[in-house]
Amino acid sequence: MLQYPHINPVALQLGPIKIHWYGLMYLLGIFAGWYLTRYRAKVKPWAPIKPEQVGDLTFYVALGVILGGRIGYIIFYNLPYYFHNPSQMFFLWDGGMSFHGGFIGVLIAFALFARKIGANFFDLGEFVAPVIPIGLGAGRIGNFINGELLGKVTDSPLGMVFPTGGPLPRYPSQLFEFFFEGVVLFSVLWLVTIKKRPRYLVLGLFMFLYGYARFICEFFRQPDPQYGYIFFNWMTMGQILSIPMILLGAVILIAVFIKTRKNKCENI
């Protein structure tokens, strides 16, 4: 059995002000995304934005992630609770963010920013997609430190007793998602960007691989208590929300493959 590290969710306290690791992980993900996107804007001749525009894009994306992630969590996962406890909607440090809601928020942010600078929406998505897994991985570390989004009870050697999860060992599902949705997905997308490739290949890969990784990792996560299993006595809300991403990613990849076969797909 693995040993839980017992990290205090509060990284720093200055009088009544508490700085949580959960928030710091989001800040780390946003900063790393800004740094790598700015680097890519300098070295990629096809970049749809200039290096000096990356700061503004990061601001748009950060708002999309925070607002979309929180609103998505409230709507998709716990609407009745927040309906009766509206003040709790603003307690972000207690956790409660939805990737799928954040993804929708980022799409809206991309659309607004692309319109502002006169860029192509899909080119912007293709350009930013390789750095998104960094934020995903950082967020999962925040979930782990918070002791939330717990895994299922297990007798596997990978089990871990969480202080918030009772006396039985559970899968550290947050670390599984950190590895597959963060480390593996970033590595794959970054390697693909090193060489010339068909336009929108990375965008399609991101959507398909993230949706697939999330769908599989959900089998190790405890279902959300307010929903449990929604279909077939095994499908969770996270899996349901991942299916559209898998399908849309597959459609993009098929379209890229067809255009490549016909020599009509531009390489970048």
UniProtKB/Swiss-Prot annotation:
Cellular component annotations (GO), alphabetically ordered: plasma membrane
Gene Ontology process terms (BP): lipoprotein biosynthetic process
Class in the EC hierarchy, top level: transferase
TM helices/strands, residue ranges: 14-34, 57-77, 90-110, 117-137, 174-194, 200-220, 238-258
EC id: 2.5.1.145
Membrane protein topology class: Multi-pass membrane protein
Homology family: Belongs to the Lgt family.
Protein's job: Catalyzes the transfer of the diacylglyceryl group from phosphatidylglycerol to the sulfhydryl group of the N-terminal cysteine of a prolipoprotein, the first step in the formation of mature lipoproteins.
Protein name per its UniProtKB record: Phosphatidylglycerol--prolipoprotein diacylglyceryl transferase
Source species of the chain: Francisella tularensis subsp. holarctica (strain LVS)
